[in-house]
């Protein structure tokens, strides 16, 4: 799948991530110019978790993000619908579960916090995914969505879009096992809702106290919310 589409085929998306799994972590670090580590730390900080918490890390991929979250002392589980990605992270000592974000294999209200980083764009129905995250979260629990977004500075936004559509695919050809996946990445970012629109959608999915802030000039946005008690 090389074109971004709001009608994503789950099998195609899972297969695409299976294909990039082996070099996924290295590719992310190279293409983000090392910012991926900063984004993971900021996500953990925004989630406000501690040793008593149970945390779901959705679209966790190779579980790099789950390991970062587990440094808080919380019990953290990595979930992803790409079996290849989970297998690539087999050496990381955190629980792993294969599952679809729109039909999570968990009971109601079991997690104190749920997070998804750079995965909501790839969910076939991301609004349904947001509702599922609310279902498995305890009343008063927390949500943090870390996702690519829209730079707010017009000049920076123009430069960034040029990077997405030209430089990023070229760099991916050099370091990725499936460069076509990064063409999809670039196009899916351009098709994604703005920060304000995503905040509205999170609220409509049953979350309250929705707020967001930009990282790296708006290349990434952190949206945080709470499940009503």
Curated annotation (Swiss-Prot):
GO terms for molecular function: demethylmenaquinone methyltransferase activity. Belongs to the class I-like SAM-binding methyltransferase superfamily. MenG/UbiE family. GO terms for biological process: menaquinone biosynthetic process; methylation. Its EC number is 2.1.1.163. SUPFAM superfamilies: S-adenosyl-L-methionine-dependent methyltransferases (SSF53335). Disulfide bonds: none annotated. Pathway: Quinol/quinone metabolism; menaquinone biosynthesis; menaquinol from 1,4-dihydroxy-2-naphthoate: step 2/2. This is Demethylmenaquinone methyltransferase. It comes from the Bacteria. It is an enzyme of class 2 (transferase). Keywords: Menaquinone biosynthesis, Methyltransferase, S-adenosyl-L-methionine, Transferase. Methyltransferase required for the conversion of demethylmenaquinol (DMKH2) to menaquinol (MKH2). InterPro entries: SAM-dependent_MTases_sf, UbiE/COQ5_MeTrFase, UbiE/COQ5_MeTrFase_CS. S-adenosyl-L-methionine binds at residues 62, 80, 100-101, 117. It catalyses: a 2-demethylmenaquinol + S-adenosyl-L-methionine = a menaquinol + S-adenosyl-L-homocysteine + H(+).
